[in-house]
A protein has these predicted regions:
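Bacterial N-terminal signal peptides that target proteins for export
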Residues: 2-12
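Bacterial N-terminal signal peptides
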Residues: 11-21
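A "functional boundary" signal
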Residues: 24-214
């Protein structure tokens, strides 16, 4: 039943997006890009990532077969890596990230490529966390943050800041953890993140202050 619901949801998104695209292109103001299609797909599929990673893998592989833009294709690869991680298939996740990174290494530097690097290193950091490689996770998250600053999409800076804070806390660097939690709060303010989504930051700060007090 869940898969049927997701299919109908995707069809509905597709119809709305096509109507919007036609109306915009007919007036000569907008033409749909492969990255637009990816972002539409990402918004549709992201809620299923933790609930049904098998479905995400299958559906994403199908989407990739229709993609002609290399940057969009690599974003699909990173999304595929996330799904593999939820399936605990770390080797497959690493392979997908490696393929995306090889493309980035050979591409002309640009904000879009920096966004892609940020996605890759944030994912690598998460994989390191799962494998208990705490110091390596700090390095990866720091690279993800630096690339995101040079990218075109800063909406995820608060998430990467939280990841960095968590990683520093795991290494026992509570002062650096507190600093990154405060940075995360600052980004939450600038991005107007709702209060109910800031709980990880408040919880992390509370834990750090308890550790520092002891």
């Amino acid at each position: 039943m869940e898969n049927i619901h997701l299919i109908f949801k995707f069809l509905w998104y597709s119809i709305l997006f096509c109507i919007w695209g036609v109306s915009c292109t007919s007036s000569g103001t907008y033409k749909k890009t492969q990255m637009d299609i990816y972002m539409q797909y990402y918004d549709f599929i992201i809620d299923s990532l933790s609930k049904n990673p098998n479905y995400v893998c299958t559906r994403t592989a199908r989407q990739m077969s229709f993609t002609t833009d290399s940057v969009a294709y690599c974003h699909y690869l990173v999304l595929l890596a996330k799904a593999y991680m939820f399936k605990s298939e770390m080797d497959s996740a690493k392979l997908s990230m490696d393929r995306a990174e090889v493309f980035c290494d050979g591409a002309e530097p640009s904000p879009l490529i920096n966004d892609l690097y940020a996605e890759i290193y944030n994912m690598r950091g998460n994989v390191c966390v799962r494998q208990g490689l705490t110091d390596s996770s700090v390095v990866c998250f720091q690279k993800a943050f630096d690339y995101r600053l040079k990218g075109s999409n800063r909406d995820m800076l608060h998430d990467i800041s939280i990841n960095l804070a968590d990683a520093f806390v795991r290494t026992g660097h509570y002062d650096k953890g507190a600093m990154w939690y405060r940075k995360a709060l600052s980004y939450c303010d600038s991005l107007k993140i709702p209060e109910e989504k800031r709980f990880p930051v408040y919880y992390g700060l509370a834990q750090v202050y308890m550790e520092l007090r002891d």
